[in-house]
């Protein structure tokens, strides 16, 4: 396995991606290019949750994906720095596809909670010239082929996780109103796998429902999975990824979402 930290900072920021990828060895069959996933943990734009990073990457690696975890800038840094870092992360994976044994046409960007919001922003803004130009890339090089969003922050309206928007915008309410993913979806938004739990009290399930409605309205392919039980921040919904003392994070029904995502990602080819 090739496990290294790769800088993807913008304007002097310290953002990185950490690789968890299969690497050819002398005694192994030659690897064909594999699909990749850039994992974007949540944390309310206040921190980057380790429970939604490395454990998810290792699970994906075991399933045949080359995985990369983004450690991005959070408050007091404000929009659009984290988005630029994510764009650079995708560009880095795609432009080094041969080195990392990645299929450049099968790059998923996967986000959890506030990380899901950041991924959603890339989904709607990848084709805006200012974003690619700000990191000396092309729009095509930063476009995700698919998205996977787990209990994502989507709306800053009635179902908002307000802390995420305050941290992202520096409490700029007018800017927050411009960053509602469900209102930004256009024809170029990538097809998307969504999952949420109905009991999520921190980021209500309506966030995923609003995004699903927007995707349907624009004719964009999606798969929506709403599990009946589980608190916000479930990650893999196992004992290993549960927040300390939070038994509600351990949910057998939710544990199958990675395989459901992989089946959906493969079948959409």
Regions found by a protein language model. Give the residues of each.
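Primarily recognizes the serine-hydrolase "nucleophile elbow" in alpha/beta-hydrolase
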Residues: 91-164, 176-177
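Conserved alpha/beta-hydrolase "acid-adjacent" motif
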Residues: 201-210
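Short beta-strand element of the alpha/beta-hydrolase
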Residues: 33-42
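C-terminal catalytic histidine-bearing segment of alpha/beta-hydrolase fold enzymes
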Residues: 213-269
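Short beta-strand/loop motif that positions the catalytic acidic residue
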Residues: 188, 194-196, 200
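Short amphipathic alpha-helix adjacent to the substrate-entry channel of hydrolases
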Residues: 31, 50-68
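N-terminal cap/lid segment of alpha/beta-hydrolase-fold proteins
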Residues: 1-32, 162
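Catalytic nucleophile-loop/oxyanion-hole region of alpha/beta-hydrolase
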Residues: 48-50, 70-104
């Amino acid at each position: 396995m090739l496990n290294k930290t790769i800088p993807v900072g913008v304007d002097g920021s310290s953002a990185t991606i950490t690789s968890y990828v299969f690497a050819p060895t002398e005694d192994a069959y030659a690897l064909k290019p594999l699909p990749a996933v850039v994992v974007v943990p949540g944390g309310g734009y206040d921190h980057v949750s380790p429970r939604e990073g490395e454990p998810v990457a290792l699970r994906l690696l075991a399933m045949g994906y080359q995985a990369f975890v983004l450690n991005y800038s959070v408050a007091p840094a404000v929009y659009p720095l984290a988005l630029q870092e994510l764009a650079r992360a995708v560009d880095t994976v795609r432009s080094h596809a041969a080195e990392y044994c990645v299929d450049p046409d099968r790059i998923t960007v996967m986000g959890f909670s506030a990380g899901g919001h950041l991924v959603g922003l890339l989904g709607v803004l990848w084709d805006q010239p200012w974003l690619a130009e700000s990191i000396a890339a092309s729009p095509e090089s930063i476009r995700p082929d698919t998205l996977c969003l787990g209990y994502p922050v989507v709306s800053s309206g009635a179902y908002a996780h307000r802390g995420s928007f305050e941290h992202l915008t520096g409490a700029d309410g007018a800017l927050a109103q411009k960053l509602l993913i469900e209102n930004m979806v256009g024809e170029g938004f990538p097809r998307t796998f969504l999952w949420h739990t109905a009991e999520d009290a921190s980021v209500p399930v309506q966030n995923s429902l609003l995004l699903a409605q927007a995707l349907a309205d624009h004719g964009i392919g999606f798969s929506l999975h709403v599990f009946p039980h589980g608190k916000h921040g479930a990650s893999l919904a196992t004992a290993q990824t549960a927040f300390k003392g939070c038994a509600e994070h351990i949910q057998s029904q939710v544990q199958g979402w990675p395989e459901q995502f992989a089946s959906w990602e493969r079948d959409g080819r």
